[in-house]
Each structure stands twice: as C-alpha cells, then as structure tokens.
Amino acid sequence: MIIPAIDLIDGQVVRLYQGDYDKQTTFDLSPLAQLKSYQDQGAKLLHIVDLTGAKDPNQRQIKLISELVAGLDVDIQVGGGIRSEQQVTELLAIGVKRVVIGSLAVKEPELVKSWLNKYGSDAICLALDVNINANGEKIVAVSGWQSAGGKTLESLVAEFERPGSKQTALKHALVTDISRDGTLTGANTALYTELAAAYPTILWQASGGIATLDDVSAVKDSKAAGIIIGKALLINQFTVEEAIQCWPNA
C-alpha cells in the first residue's frame, strides 16, 4: 500500500534530513491541499507527523490535525509526541484512524500494551526508528530521534509480539532506517525483507530513502505491507498515481 506522508512544524509542510531539526526544508504548500491531492490520486491512507509535538509534546498541533482530518475522506494515521492516553483518545475522537507511538513504546511498553488492549490493534501503530550500527544491530531511537533508546528493534518487538493470553497482539509497525530518511538514497529493502519474514503477523510499513518508482517496487517485493513516501512526492520525483500503479492498493 502507498502511504503518502507530510511532516508539519508550526503549521508548515517540512522535511528534515535524517531527522535533524537543524536540517529542515520548508515547502510553500497548504497541508490540506497537499493531502487532498494525494487523496484524489487514489491514496487510501495518509500519514501525518507532528514534528513540533515530537520535539515538545506541549506544543502539539492538534487544532491543525483536527482540521486536516475533517477535510479529508480517507484514513489518517498520526504520529509525533504522543506521550499520554489523553492524547491518544483526543486523536481518535477527532477521527484519526491510527495513532503512531514512538518513544513511549521504548520507555513505557506496558502502558502502550494497555492501549492496544483498550483501543484495539488497528488503532495503534508502533514507530520504530532505527540506527543500524557497525555490528548490524538495529538500535531504536527516541524523542524525535534526539537520543538513542538503548533497545534493539528485535527486543522491543518481542515485548509486543509474544503476548500473554490477555494481551492484544501488535498488528501495525512502521520502521524507518534513520540513515536513509530524507536522503532519497533508496530504501533499506534488506531490513524490510528480514522483518516481514521474522514477524509475518505484523503489517510492516517501510519508511526512509524512497526516491524512485524502482524503490517502490523493491519495497513491495520485500513483503512490507506498505510504504511511507514523503520527500519524493513533495519534490515531484513521481506522483501518488504512478506509485499506486507500481503497488496497487489492497
């Protein structure tokens, strides 16, 4: 599935290079008009990242997100700075389909597991943003990528993937190779192939580095369930319509 994405800072559409707030590109675009364009080209799910909220949860752009959700007809998933159940319920109440949880899944996995139980596996998506070190270990970053979480991707997934009898299993997870994010250097398809094979019950969303339609096809072949595309669409590398031709929506 093709999942067009926009990142927002203070109401503006932006892109960061490798998650670095000091390497920001701002686009002179209306967030709603851009998302509507993606919707009109056939996207069935849109991804919004509140980067202001990721950096400072007290500054979350909830009013803007509410306006965007109200102005669109397709499913929306939202991430960035989700730190409390109140924020989860707030997003679900305004019509967000799925809340994307990053840092908190590393810091307080039991809390996030309780949300899976309460709201269901379709309402929660884990965002696992990884730095892959020289030993090939996938270390999960936290707090808008401003610090390392200290856990490996595998150890974190194991906490959610092997639930007890009363635990709702994880269904959706988004994985970004930070070294590829915003770089247009191609996706880390080996990573997604490995994850899809190791954890076949999880619907993996691939993110980071998508530059060409060949990249889209390569991620499709990796058996990921979906692909997040941000910068490539903003700079007109290709269109949503063209991407969907490579990877028709299920």
UniProtKB/Swiss-Prot annotation:
One GO MF term attached to the UniProt entry: 1-(5-phosphoribosyl)-5-[(5-phosphoribosylamino)methylideneamino]imidazole-4-carboxamide isomerase activity
Gene3D superfamilies named in the record: Aldolase class I
Domain of life: Bacteria
Signal sequence annotation: none
Pathway where this protein functions: Amino-acid biosynthesis; L-histidine biosynthesis; L-histidine from 5-phospho-alpha-D-ribose 1-diphosphate: step 4/9
The keyword Acetylation appears for this protein: no
Catalysis performed (reactions): 1-(5-phospho-beta-D-ribosyl)-5-[(5-phospho-beta-D-ribosylamino)methylideneamino]imidazole-4-carboxamide = 5-[(5-phospho-1-deoxy-D-ribulos-1-ylimino)methylamino]-1-(5-phospho-beta-D-ribosyl)imidazole-4-carboxamide
Keywords, sorted A to Z: Amino-acid biosynthesis, Cytoplasm, Histidine biosynthesis, Isomerase
Gene Ontology CC annotations of this record: cytoplasm
Principal subcellular localization: cytoplasm
UniProt key word S-adenosyl-L-methionine: no
EC number from the UniProt entry: 5.3.1.16
Enzyme class per UniProt: isomerase
Biological process annotations from GO: L-histidine biosynthetic process; L-tryptophan biosynthetic process
Residues at the active site: D7, D129
Subcellular location field: Cytoplasm
NCBIfam families the record matches: 1-(5-phosphoribosyl)-5-[(5-phosphoribosylamino)methylideneamino]imidazole-4-carboxamide isomerase
Family (UniProt): Belongs to the HisA/HisF family.
HAMAP family named among the record's database cross-references: HisA
Name of the featured protein: 1-(5-phosphoribosyl)-5-[(5-phosphoribosylamino)methylideneamino] imidazole-4-carboxamide isomerase
Record organism: Shewanella denitrificans (strain OS217 / ATCC BAA-1090 / DSM 15013)
